[in-house]
Amino acid sequence: METEAVDVAVAVARKLCSELIAAEPLGEITGLVSDCFSHLVSTPHLVVRINDALYEAARAQIERQATQSGFEGRLVILAEPSIASGDCRIEWADGGVVLERAAIEAKISELVGRYMASRDQAGRP
């Protein structure tokens, strides 16, 4: 019964996530970009890679965020058809960050599976 409850909860979370990203594909992207700008104000170069269908809307928002945050470096925004809608890659000279929903979902599935397996091995119902 517990396994089924966990499966239902994960399925609901996936569905909700998909619906939210479909409704607001730039929501998480602009949040992540804003966080990067707050920590990388003096970075000389920042590259944001996004889905090509979101390019125009994202470009305007990201450029506005750069100005508001005081970012003075070179900002490059690239449209990439291989990046899923709602995902992005942000890169700078010393690092970067990736928002990739498929990888997040895979990690969640792995962790839930491990948790349930450990409960089964411990003899819990």
What are these regions (language model features)?
Residues M1-P125:
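Elongated, mostly alpha-helical coiled-coil "stalk/stator" tethers of large membrane protein machines
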